[in-house]
Amino acid sequence: ILMLTLVTENRTPLLGILKGDQIEKTPIGQKAAEEIQKIPTYDGAKSIEIYSYIVMPDHIHILLRIHEKLPIHIGNYIRWFKKQCTDNCRALGVPTTRLFALEYHDRILKGKHQLEHMAKYINDNPRRLALKRQNKELFTLQQDILLNNIPCTTMGNMFLAEYPIKQVIQCSRRLTQEQIDELKAQCLAQAQEGTIHITAAISEGEKQIARALREAEYPIIVLLQEGFPKPDSPHYRYYKPAGVYFEACAKGKLLLVEPHAEVLERSEIITRTEAKIGKIPHDTQRYRFVAMNVVAEMMAGGERES
């Protein structure tokens, strides 16, 4: 199974218009949909089956099921598809050098679970686009935000950072499942009383507790390390969190925070990190993980109790 993503040149929305939570295809988008159906005929052997696809205003997703070894490289199918779409675009009176950008993204899916998950994801694209447009302030990357004097890039509900009662989720990797479950119950009880939790979600225990809070729809602040595209990246403008983080963000229940790279080298953070684990190289995973939890403590306004 192969998932293909193609975007229009300069992300120009020529393929469709969002109406409610559905995409109304333009004539160009309708022609692109028709060309998608023709992809299995390109090699004459019908080695490819179209499992699912979606046409969005400025991009398309296609799920291909490949039944046997292709007689030609998949790139040849894509080039042929893009050429046909560009020809159709010109025939409709829209002058363009090319409809789709030169690059494309492909991803191999393994197993029925990945296939079903990705099919659900691409079919849900219009609804998620509607949510993003309805909640622009929640899906805008904000640069150089200071949280407790820590410079960050953020996305989500900034009001969560201003709430006075915040608690860090921090779990040692040595905790047993029983201990994790006990801490999870404590965090859920705190959240019910109004506490906002902060976590880097690094250890298994931290991930489990963050998941439980999210599933219960309690607000949460999640620290990321190199989680956002850079401002000069072509993906910066179009970034949105994936999966469950997207849903939480749309509901105003999530704040994603990426401390600037130099933050982990601040003297105060180095001192507090080394007090926990001793002096180790700063480029190690261990140092970065513990330092991120120190940053979470500082954003919460102190150190985690217990």
Language model features with spans:
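Glycine-biased, small-residue-rich flexible motifs in mid-sequence functional cores and linkers
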Residues: 141-306
